[in-house]
């Protein structure tokens, strides 16, 4: 019985040697591109989702959680608002003459001096923030006939009643308050910012007690402007034990101009001026901590890297920042179209080319060759076509960043309640800009992705056509990215095809002869190999069944005896 089974096995092996796929006079050469098991989906102009081997995320969606103190000079407002620091609130004295690129206002900031309001708060805040300094110069104003340096228990500096350090509260001297008429020329070559105010007593009694006159008036003029303020006497909500208020105003005096102050009462006078500088300093409301790190881009959420062209962390930014978009993700293709390799290629592991799928594990190149010949199988990358594709894809990310990064800051915009319609319009414009940029970003990335995929497909086709031109009639295009070579082609021959030194004339006669011989016996169906192997397997199976049947019949008749020993 053992002899019969052994003979059957030998017979099947002999038949297998005569199948066309094992003919040593031919070889198979396939071309394909790199593939990965799990690619990345990107969007192109023609396809919402197409898989590529590699892609780079273009949207920065998270911050560091802290504001970096470099390269920008960050000034932490702590418990002080910028306006309180400007006026000289006692608990903000540490900010005198400070400079910054970005002033960070905290939600915990508070005022701790005489209650005040600023009718044009947003404009003053923006002006001082962009100036980037609280540098203050005292001037010798001549306030004759009045008492200076008024203070209040609502504004303590240590244990003493005090006032804003940059303002001078004037009130009557003995029982008189003369008309004040003071001028101050600007003989320097820069703009000067003067901060002044008007006191609004809570009662008529307080008005006459401080300023004698029942109604005061303050007029501040330059050659270009004039402001006249009449105090509004009356009670207001109590703040820090007071129902009176101070209104803060400001005047810019240009070089060569003159500041003129005229008043018969209620004047909160300036002590000097602030230097106004032009620059790109700014202010931001944020509760993010300030850390020791470096980042060009700052948002209220914290600093973010600017190595991506887009971000959706916050609309408010400072520095060289990615463009704000609504999308959470935009992926830029930096690899080729991905067609994962099929895990099984038939019973005998046939190879296939790029028409069917890519190849995994090709780490030394994007495009390459696989071959099957009398010496076995092998694989090699084509470095020239790989480098051609990489050279064109490299730099895509940098080019997109250059097109989109803002080299300026997007400041916070504030409006008073009376400017509500302007605020609504500004919000509409900002939202429209964001919508437009979000659409443009998606379109830009889709165009770049389309170009990348078309480019990598083109390099694959170029390599295939180059190989076809070398082989000519010595091989047949199998329609799946492979060539059936009709002559014996060892590894040296395969290498010459890869490096472009293959001479088809050397193998022409052998190839033509083999082509005609093989064509005479090959099936024309696309499933010829499958049919041959299935027929072979069925034949072997039937042969074994017949032999086993014969053995069982012989045993039953007593012609063969089987002994089973344990």
UniProtKB/Swiss-Prot annotation:
This is Hemagglutinin. The gene is HA. Major glycoprotein, comprises over 80% of the envelope proteins present in virus particle. The chain crosses the membrane at residues 531-551. It is found in: Virion membrane; Host apical cell membrane. The keyword Disulfide bond applies. It is a single-pass type I membrane protein. A lipid is attached at residues 555, 562, 565 (S-palmitoyl cysteine). GO terms for biological process: clathrin-dependent endocytosis of virus by host cell; fusion of virus membrane with host endosome membrane; fusion of virus membrane with host plasma membrane; viral budding from plasma membrane; virion attachment to host cell. Binds to sialic acid-containing receptors on the cell surface, bringing about the attachment of the virus particle to the cell. This attachment induces virion internalization of about two third of the virus particles through clathrin-dependent endocytosis and about one third through a clathrin- and caveolin-independent pathway. Plays a major role in the determination of host range restriction and virulence. Class I viral fusion protein. Belongs to the influenza viruses hemagglutinin family. GO terms for molecular function: host cell surface receptor binding.
């Amino acid at each position: 019985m053992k002899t019969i089974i052994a003979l059957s096995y030998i017979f099947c092996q002999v038949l297998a040697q005569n199948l066309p796929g094992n003919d040593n006079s031919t070889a198979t050469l396939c071309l394909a591109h790199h593939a990965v098991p799990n690619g990345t989906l990107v969007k192109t102009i023609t396809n919402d989702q197409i898989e590529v081997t590699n892609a780079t995320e273009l949207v920065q969606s998270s911050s560091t959680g802290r504001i970096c103190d470099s390269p920008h000079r960050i000034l932490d407002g702590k418990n002080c608002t910028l306006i309180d620091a400007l006026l000289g609130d006692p608990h903000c004295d540490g900010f005198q003459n400070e400079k910054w690129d970005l002033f960070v206002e905290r939600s915990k900031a508070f005022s701790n001096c005489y209650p005040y309001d600023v009718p044009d708060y947003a404009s003053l805040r923006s002006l001082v923030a962009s100036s980037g300094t609280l540098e203050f110069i005292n001037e010798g104003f001549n306030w004759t006939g009045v008492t200076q340096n008024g203070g209040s228990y609502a504004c303590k500096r240590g244990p003493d009643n005090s006032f804003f350090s940059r303002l001078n509260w004037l009130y009557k001297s003995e029982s008189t308050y003369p008309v004040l008429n003071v001028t101050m020329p600007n003989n320097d070559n820069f703009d000067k910012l003067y901060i002044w105010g008007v006191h609004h007593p809570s009662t008529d009694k307080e008005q006459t007690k401080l300023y004698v006159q029942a109604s005061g008036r303050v007029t501040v003029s330059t050659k270009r402007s004039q402001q006249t303020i009449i105090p509004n006497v009356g009670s207001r909500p109590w703040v820090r034990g007071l129902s009176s208020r101070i209104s803060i105003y400001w005047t810019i005096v240009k070089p060569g101009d003159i500041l003129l102050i005229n008043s018969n009462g209620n004047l909160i006078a300036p002590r000097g001026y602030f230097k106004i500088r032009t620059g790109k300093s700014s202010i931001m409301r944020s509760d993010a901590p300030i850390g020791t790190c470096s980042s060009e881009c700052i948002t209220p959420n914290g600093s973010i890297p600017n190595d991506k062209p887009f971000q959706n962390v916050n609309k408010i930014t400072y520095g060289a920042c990615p463009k704000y978009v609504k999308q959470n993700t935009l992926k830029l293709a930096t690899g080729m179209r991905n067609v994962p390799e099929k895990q099984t290629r038939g019973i005998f592991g046939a190879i296939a080319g790029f028409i069917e799928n890519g190849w995994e594990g090709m780490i030394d190149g994007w495009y390459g060759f696989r071959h099957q010949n009398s010496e076995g199988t092998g694989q090699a990358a084509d470095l020239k076509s790989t480098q051609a594709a990489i050279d064109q894809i490299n730099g895509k990310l940098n080019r997109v960043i250059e097109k989109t990064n803002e080299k300026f800051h997007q400041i916070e915009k504030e409006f008073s309640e009376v400017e509500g319609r302007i605020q609504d319009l500004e919000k509409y414009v900002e939202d429209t800009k964001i919508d437009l940029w979000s659409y443009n970003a998606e379109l830009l990335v889709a165009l770049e992705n389309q170009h990348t995929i078309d480019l990598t497909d083109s390099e694959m086709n170029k390599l295939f056509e180059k190989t076809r031109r070398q082989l000519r009639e010595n091989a047949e295009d199998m329609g799946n990215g492979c060539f059936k070579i009709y002559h014996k082609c060892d590894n040296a021959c395969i290498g010459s095809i890869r490096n472009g030194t293959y001479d088809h004339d050397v193998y022409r006669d052998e190839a033509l002869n083999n082509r005609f011989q093989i064509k005479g016996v090959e099936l024309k169906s696309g499933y010829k190999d499958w049919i041959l192997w299935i027929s072979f397997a069925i034949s072997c199976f039937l042969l074994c069944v017949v032999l086993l049947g014969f053995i069982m019949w012989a045993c039953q008749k007593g012609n063969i005896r089987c002994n089973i020993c344990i």
